[in-house]
């Protein structure tokens, strides 16, 4: 999340904006919240997020998201920049929400999408795997030990819908285990 500079979506897929009208006891969302989710993943997302009831406000094709700008979830904590939504062919509809967090300094797809759209590529992590001292919230934390800090800050900012364990590839040296 510290390196996030955009969010990718599928221009060809359908998305639904839903209004949450019921939640499970331990849900992160609140009744009245509205979220946008890929239509193909809606049932999976509401189950994982503990959403017990909702209604669909609208359904639309992803290309209608072009030009949408979001706030970084850590705005007010050193992340004072806009997060554009960008169409990308690599967004898949088999897991997640139908959106992909884009950190152009941390992956080849992210890099290519960022560069193609004039997104600044931040330098956030040193060769030792530690976030640089000028990275707000995460300074000095190793990337493989930042999960709890990310989750807690997302929760505190009201931007956490659900959390769980996933396997995610990250560019690093298999020999040294350093990013």
Model-derived features with residue positions:
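A broadly tuned preference for mixed-charge, low-complexity surface segments
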Residues: 44-51, 156-167, 175
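Generic, well-ordered alpha-helical scaffold segments in large soluble proteins
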Residues: 73, 113, 117-120, 149-157, ...
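Intrinsically disordered or highly flexible coil/loop and linker segments, enriched in small
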Residues: 79, 159-160, 179
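The substrate-binding groove and active-site-proximal loops of carbohydrate-active enzymes
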Residues: 99-101, 133-143
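Short linear loop/turn motifs
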Residues: 127-131, 168-171
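Phosphate/diphosphate-binding loops
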Residues: 142-170
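Cys/His-rich short segments
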Residues: 172-179
């Amino acid at each position: 999340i510290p390196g996030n500079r955009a969010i990718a979506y599928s221009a060809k897929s359908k998305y639904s904006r839903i209004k949450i009208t019921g939640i499970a006891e331990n849900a992160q969302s609140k009744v009245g919240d509205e979220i946008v989710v890929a239509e193909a993943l809606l049932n999976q997302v509401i189950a994982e997020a503990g959403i017990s009831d909702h209604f669909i406000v609208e359904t639309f094709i992803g290309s209608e998201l072009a030009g949408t700008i979001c706030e970084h979830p850590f705005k007010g904590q050193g992340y004072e920049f806009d997060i554009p939504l960008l169409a990308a062919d690599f967004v898949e509809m088999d897991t997640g929400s139908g959106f992909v967090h884009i950190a152009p300094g941390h992956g080849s797809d992210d890099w290519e999408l960022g560069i193609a759209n004039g997104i600044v590529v931040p330098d956030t992590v040193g060769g030792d795997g530690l976030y640089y001292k000028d990275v707000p919230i995460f300074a000095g934390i190793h990337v493989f030990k930042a999960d709890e800090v990310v989750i807690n800050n997302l929760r505190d900012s009201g931007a956490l819908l659900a959390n769980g364990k996933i396997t995610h590839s990250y560019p690093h040296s298999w020999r040294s285990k350093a990013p």
